[in-house]
């Protein structure tokens, strides 16, 4: 026998078994009894005098085991030698006391009780199985009604409910011919007598014969539950309990406090209540008490058990002495403080500490300063070991003493221990994987951790009192992973976008910018130097200044054919500072990268180039040197802020006067009634917005240039050396918007609801604010702070949902071999290329050959990873679109393949197997969310709103073409007025390639013609941004219909002007029901008073006024084509901010149907309008075969198509927000992906955040992972059920192999919350949200969790199947397969 096992009796053979899956089910009464070590009969806990557990009570030692190790309760048997003996006096087995954590007991219930989860967790499972309503079942269970369990020969129905009076009447009538019961017994009887297999047959037949949709849904649901029971072999009556398991006592402890009181777990109270009621019920049954008393006791028992299992699920929650609800078993596992999230997914760890961080500017990138005191504590065991090994201490106790006395040898040993032993630093909140990085510790005095300044960006740390936690990786493997994967110097690129995240900021940028700026006519200008050393000497002897323009010979290193560096000497026109900087450049980085004023963007490009050209190691060293240099020169520069640096532009007074005059003019127009109040407000806001911008521009022009005398004595402009300007220009701190507030004007402010206050703050911070101005300013500033707090929570929750939906997505194979993919084009908006094609395809794998459009030769073959070189080549050849692989179309079943994902952004090469790309995607999208939410208040609530666009201009020369949907009429002034809803002007270059595309709104005036040659900067069209006009396409005399004052239109008289206008009233607000359907319209008459018809038809022209329209024509007025009939004022402009942004991202990922969604054409065909019904318009689309599709559209909606127009399937026909589900259904997966990626990117772009499209695609893949079975074929699925895409694919392959009919399915788009909850793994779903519901469902289905994802493995305490853990899982899997093969072979040989 193994000696080691003597001391660990618990490690019996069964404990250490490896498992591959976890199955959940409903426990049968026999199972519960088999777990139990005895029945708990008394509600007592412990004897309050002796503190010993009461016999047969909730803490009984006989049932649950001894209180002290190897000692029975009465003390007859003590010590290890009696191990395993059961004391005959007190009945306690002598063993370890920790069995009290694992031995369960049970309570035999005197009456059966329904399990509340199966009753009340919606939809009620009991109700589904029995086909009864929840209300009915509850009436039976809580003793309000009888249920007929066996009607016998009587006309009663099975499952019929009878009230008490009914029951006694029927008893008198039929005698014992029928059975009816009350309470859980009745329900149990019904469940026991239900023939599951027979019921399934009946339901399947019904499913085929029925036609109604609701019925099919209902049957399918019942079928699913019943089939699950049938498959798993669980019995229906197990949902009703006869016997209740009792939790081991150490998991619900009773702790004596000082002063004779006890602290107890709520569960003990709940169990006591159950036992008390159960015992009382037993006694009443023995005494044959009257029915009514027994019934009441049974009901109370049912309620007690309900509270124990899930308190508060039904009725009022049971409360303890202090009036708060007791914590039941269900509460123990759910929510943030429950078992899953508190103890399984987030544990506290040993060997960790935390302290404040300070800056360590002398550190190297892979180092951090660790206070000696902390190191001593963290590395204690290692030090003890070393002390014993070196013979300085004979025992651990002695070593401990030495460490406590801090003898000198201890410090030497600490140095030794720490050498080459990385530690991990973490800053909360850890929003992405760079929130934990490994460093080599350097021992320092003091109590603060020193952090390298360049990693601050990754941690989002600053030194204003932030704290960080230290963790020590103990095992060799952990140290190795920390060093190779997590060391700060190995994490130069951001996983979100593949750009460097180790980028200098603030003082470093300022120093580098200062040293690389040039000054005109500085000391020693025009000197020639032989090499950098000479420049050094000249600089140190003050012959030249830092910004002096000089010519110098520089030696650069260039790679030759063989890949070796050889020196090349060139002469450069440069400055002293840049020449000095050239010394720290790594080999292979050309001097031209630093031969300019280095701003933050340039430095970022510099580090990026260094990484691509010189590799990781050189880049890290280079970054460090940049930092030291930057700090040094920032100190030498002595750049500071003074009041005089804030120069107020002289033009300010004039500009303000001009704006005030304009505002006065608008006010006058408003008084005359030419504009509405809303328009006036919008225009005033616009004027002030523009005025602010003009003042800001004047101020920046003033700040950025200064006059100097050059060498020849002429006065010239040079870039300013104003400190504030330099800080903003270099990107070190501040921005033009902030300088504008310091020395321009503060500008417009926002109210807390986001609308803009029309009186701006005209003064700036240098002049100071008046009391009123200060008061206006406080609004925005406070809102900013309040927003921040709310949004941080929102953003964290979004990240949590994203991580949850993608956590099991890991790269598992190299190539799935698909040739599917998406076609990538450059993103163009309004003629600006927002994202070039090269940016979008860099680091992707091509799905098909890339062909040169001019020569037709293949540039890049399919299946190639596009590197910078290849992308440049594609860019130069003028290719417009490239088809690339994408995670969405990857065919790998559980996980992704490397080729569909492409480049690992943080490493710059093809992604490795085992990379957890799902989690990285979730972090990359979630992390900036929090950053953005926090970035609202930095401008101090100043309204940042783009002045509304009122025209479009061409950006380049070319030819203007109108899109196919373009419709316009010429008005009597000869202007072309746009009357189409989705019109675009496209500009083609000389070869005919599309260069720009501009949307032109309805009612715009076109200033160009189709096919006209245009120049860059030419205006293409103009319009009024604040109102939408309503324009007539025909000429004639106005005749109103249903335009009745006080019924359909209201006369609005303006208080200020006294003028009145007619405004259309919203139908819902009209008084009588008849008037609700009336539609104010305008018809046109010719000179004879006959209605004018649409040319070529007999339909009279009739145009309806939309709600809120201000009618501008009068009855009987003559109008011409293109004239305005009415104006619809646009809502006032709110500030655009990520506030609208973060919820927008969440809305997209949750795939919510927007409030007033637009409509897409269901089929391709021709549009016509049918008869109106109930105030709705009937729109008909007829396809080529004459099949018509009809839809009703409410009057408020704006229809974008006209009679006779041809539309394509999926084209927008009714204005409104697009519903992503429609896009998926009508245009397919690629269109949907493009839409979501575009919309999400738009939000982030607005904030200047770069995220790779890949990450969004990874999440879309997870949103599309389930499909709806449209026709099950011969695959065994149920029509209409939702299943994993992979499962259908596998089933279809199998069906085709066997020659059966495969299933047809439709794609389904799930929001991220739903997708997380619908995952195959119930452990992952339960730990996410709605724990009770998930577990109830899983138990009924008898689900098995294969532990495929990361989360499940974390919860069961294994290595995750990603990264280095993937190999562990794979090898386990292989061993398991080998064992299976061997057993199979042995069986064959046996036979």
UniProtKB/Swiss-Prot annotation:
Cofactor binding description: Binds 1 Mg(2+) ion per subunit.
Pfam families: RNA_pol_Rpb1_1, RNA_pol_Rpb1_2, RNA_pol_Rpb1_3, RNA_pol_Rpb1_4, RNA_pol_Rpb1_5
EC number(s) given by UniProt: 2.7.7.6
Keyword line: DNA-directed RNA polymerase, Magnesium, Metal-binding, Nucleotidyltransferase, Transcription, Transferase, Zinc
Name of the protein described by the UniProt record: DNA-directed RNA polymerase subunit beta'
UniProt-listed PANTHER family: DNA-DIRECTED RNA POLYMERASE, DNA-DIRECTED RNA POLYMERASE SUBUNIT BETA
Annotated positions binding Zn(2+) 2: 816, 890, 897, 900
GO MF: DNA binding; DNA-directed RNA polymerase activity; magnesium ion binding; zinc ion binding
Gene: rpoC
């Amino acid at each position: 026998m193994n000696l080691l096992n003597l001391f660990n009796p618990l490690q019996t053979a069964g404990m250490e078994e490896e498992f591959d899956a976890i199955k959940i089910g409903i426990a049968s009464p026999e199972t519960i009894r088999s777990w139990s070590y005895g029945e708990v009969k008394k509600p007592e806990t412990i004897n309050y005098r002796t503190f010993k557990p009461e016999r047969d009570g909730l803490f009984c030692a006989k049932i649950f085991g001894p209180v002290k190790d190897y000692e029975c309760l009465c003390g007859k048997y003590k010590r290890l030698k009696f191990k395993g003996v059961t004391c005959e006096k007190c009945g306690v087995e002598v063993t370890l006391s920790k069995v009290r954590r694992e031995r369960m007991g049970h309570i035999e219930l005197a009456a059966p009780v329904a399990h509340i989860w199966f009753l009340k967790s919606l939809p009620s499972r009991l109700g589904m199985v029995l086909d009864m309503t929840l209300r009915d079942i509850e009436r039976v269970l809580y003793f309000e009604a009888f249920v007929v369990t066996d009607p016998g020969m009587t006309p009663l129905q099975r499952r019929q409910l009878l009230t008490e009076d009914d029951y006694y009447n029927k008893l008198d009538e039929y005698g014992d011919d029928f059975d009816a019961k009350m309470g859980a017994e009745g329900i149990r009887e019904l469940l026991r007598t239900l023939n599951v297999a027979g019921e399934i047959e009946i339901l399947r037949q019904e499913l085929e014969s029925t036609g109604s949709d609701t019925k099919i849904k209902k049957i399918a649901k019942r079928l699913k539950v019943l089939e699950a029971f049938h498959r798993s072999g669980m019995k229906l009556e197990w949902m009703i309990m006869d016997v209740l398991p009792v939790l081991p006592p150490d998991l619900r402890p009773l702790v004596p406090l000082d002063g004779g009181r006890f602290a107890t777990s709520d569960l003990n109270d709940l169990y006591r209540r159950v036992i008390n009621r159960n015992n009382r019920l037993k006694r009443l049954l023995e005494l044959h008490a009257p029915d009514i008393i027994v019934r009441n006791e049974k009901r109370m028992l049912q309620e007690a058990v309900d509270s124990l299992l899930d308190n508060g699920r039904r009725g009022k929650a049971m409360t303890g002495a202090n009036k708060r609800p007791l914590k039941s078993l269900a509460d123990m596992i759910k929510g943030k403080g429950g078992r899953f999230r508190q103890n399984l997914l987030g544990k506290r760890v040993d060997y960790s500490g935390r302290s404040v961080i300070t800056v360590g500017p002398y550190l190297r990138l892979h180092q951090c300063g660790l206070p000696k005191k902390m190191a001593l504590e963290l590395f204690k065991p290692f030090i003890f070991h070393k002390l014993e090994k070196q013979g300085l201490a004979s025992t651990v106790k002695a070593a401990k003493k030495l460490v406590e006395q801090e003898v000198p040898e201890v410090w030497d040993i600490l140095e030794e221990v720490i050498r080459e032993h990385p530690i991990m630093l973490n800053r909360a909140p850890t929003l992405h994987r760079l929130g934990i990085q490994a460093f080599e510790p350097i021992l320092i005095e003091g109590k603060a951790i020193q952090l390298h300044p360049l990693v601050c960006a990754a941690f989002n740390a600053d030194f204003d009192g932030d704290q960080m936690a230290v963790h020590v990786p103990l095992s060799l493997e952990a140290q190795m992973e920390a060093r190779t994967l997590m060391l700060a110097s190995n994490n130069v690129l951001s996983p979100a976008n593949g750009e460097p995240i180790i980028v200098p900021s603030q003082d470093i940028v300022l120093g580098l910018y200062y040293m690389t700026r040039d000054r005109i006519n500085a000391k020693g200008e025009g000197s020639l130097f032989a090499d950098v050393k000479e420049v050094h000497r000249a600089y140190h002897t003050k012959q030249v200044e830092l910004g002096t323009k000089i010519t110098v010979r520089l030696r650069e290193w260039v790679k030759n054919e063989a890949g070796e560096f050889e020196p090349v000497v060139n002469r450069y026109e440069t400055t002293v500072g840049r020449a000095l900087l050239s010394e720290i450049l790594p080999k292979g980085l050309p001097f031209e990268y630093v031969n300019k004023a280095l701003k933050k963007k340039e430095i970022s490009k510099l580090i990026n180039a260094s990484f691509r050209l010189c590799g990781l190691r050189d880049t890290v060293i280079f970054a460090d040197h940049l930092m030291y240099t930057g700090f040094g020169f920032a100190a030498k520069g002595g750049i500071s802020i003074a009041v005089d640096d804030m120069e107020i532009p002289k033009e300010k007074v004039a500009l303000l006067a001009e704006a005030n005059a304009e505002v006065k003019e608008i006010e006058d127009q408003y008084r005359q009634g030419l504009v509405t109040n809303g328009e006036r407000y919008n225009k005033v806001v616009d004027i002030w917005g523009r005025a602010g911008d003009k003042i800001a521009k004047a101020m920046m022009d003033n700040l950025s240039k200064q006059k100097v005398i050059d060498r020849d004595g002429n006065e010239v402009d040079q870039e300013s050396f104003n400190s504030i300007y330099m800080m903003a220009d270099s990107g070190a701190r501040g921005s033009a918007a902030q300088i504008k507030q310091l020395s321009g004007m503060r500008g417009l402010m926002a109210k807390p609801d986001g609308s803009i206050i029309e009186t701006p703050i005209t003064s700036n911070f240098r002049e100071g604010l008046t009391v009123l101005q200060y008061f206006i300013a406080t609004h925005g500033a406070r809102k900013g702070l309040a927003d921040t707090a709310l949004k941080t929570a929102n953003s964290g929750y979004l990240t949590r949902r994203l991580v949850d939906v993608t956590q099991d997505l890991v790269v598992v194979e190299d190539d799935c071999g698909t040739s599917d993919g998406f076609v990538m084009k450059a993103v163009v908006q309004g003629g600006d290329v927002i994202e070039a094609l090269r940016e979008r395809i860099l680091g992707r794998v091509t799905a098909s050959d890339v062909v040169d459009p001019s020569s037709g030769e293949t540039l890049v073959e399919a299946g190639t990873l596009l590197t910078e070189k290849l992308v440049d080549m594609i860019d130069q050849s003028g290719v417009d679109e490239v088809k690339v692989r994408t995670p969405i179309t990857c065919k790998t079943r559980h996980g992704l393949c490397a080729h569909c994902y492409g480049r690992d952004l943080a490493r710059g090469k093809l992604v490795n197997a085992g990379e957890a790309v799902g989690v990285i995607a979730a972090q990359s999208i979630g992390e900036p969310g929090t950053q953005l939410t926090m970035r609202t208040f930095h401008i101090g609530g100043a309204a940042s709103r783009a002045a509304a666009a009122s025209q479009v201009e061409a950006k380049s020369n070319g030819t203007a073409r109108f899109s196919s949907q373009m419709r316009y009429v010429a008005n009597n002034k000869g202007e072309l007025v746009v009357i189409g809803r989705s019109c675009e002007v496209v500009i083609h270059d000389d070869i005919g390639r599309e260069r720009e595309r501009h949307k032109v709104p309805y009612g715009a005036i076109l200033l160009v013609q189709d096919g006209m040659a245009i120049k860059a900067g030419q205006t293409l069209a103009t319009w009024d941004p604040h109102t939408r006009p309503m324009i007539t396409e025909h000429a004639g005399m106005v005749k109103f219909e249903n335009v009745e004052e006080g019924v359909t239109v209201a006369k609005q008289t303006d208080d200020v002007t006294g003028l009145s206008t007619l405004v259309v009233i919203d139908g819902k607000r009209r008084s009588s029901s008849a008037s609700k359907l009336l539609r104010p319209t305008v018809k046109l008459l010719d000179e004879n008073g006959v209605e004018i018809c649409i040319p070529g038809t007999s339909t009279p022209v009739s145009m309806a006024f939309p709600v809120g329209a201000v009618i501008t024509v009068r009855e009987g007025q003559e109008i011409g084509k293109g004239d305005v009939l009415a104006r619809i004022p646009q809502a006032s402009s709110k500030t655009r901010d990520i506030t609208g942004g973060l919820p927008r991202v969440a809305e997209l990922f949750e795939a919510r149907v927007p409030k007033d969604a637009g409509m897409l054409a269901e089929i391709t065909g021709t549009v016509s309008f049918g008869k109106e019904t109930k105030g709705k318009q009937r729109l008909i689309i007829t396809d080529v075969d004459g099949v018509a599709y009809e839809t009703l559209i409410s009057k408020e909606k704006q229809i974008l198509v006209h009679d006779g127009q041809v539309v394509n399937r999926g084209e927008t026909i009714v204005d409104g927000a697009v519903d992503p589900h429609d896009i998926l259904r009508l245009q397919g997966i690629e269109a949907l992906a493009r839409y979501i990626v575009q919309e999400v990117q738009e939000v982030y772009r607005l904030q200047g955040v770069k995220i790779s499209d890949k990450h969004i695609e990874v999440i879309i893949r997870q949103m599309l992972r389930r499909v709806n079975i449209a026709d099950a074929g011969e695959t065994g699925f149920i029509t209409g059920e939702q299943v994993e895409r992979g499962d259908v694919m596998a089933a279809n392959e199998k069906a085709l192999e066997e020659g059966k009919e495969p299933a047809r399915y439709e794609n389904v788009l799930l929001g991220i919350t739903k997708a997380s909850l619908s995952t195959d793994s119930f452990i992952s779903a339960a730990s996410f949200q709605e724990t009770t519901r998930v577990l109830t469902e899983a138990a009924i289905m008898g689900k098995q969790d294969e532990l495929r994802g990361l989360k499940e493995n974390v919860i069961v305490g294994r290595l995750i199947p990603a990264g280095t853990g993937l190999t562990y899982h794979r090898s386990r899997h292989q061993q398991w397969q080998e064992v299976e093969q061997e057993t199979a072979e042995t069986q064959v040989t046996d036979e």
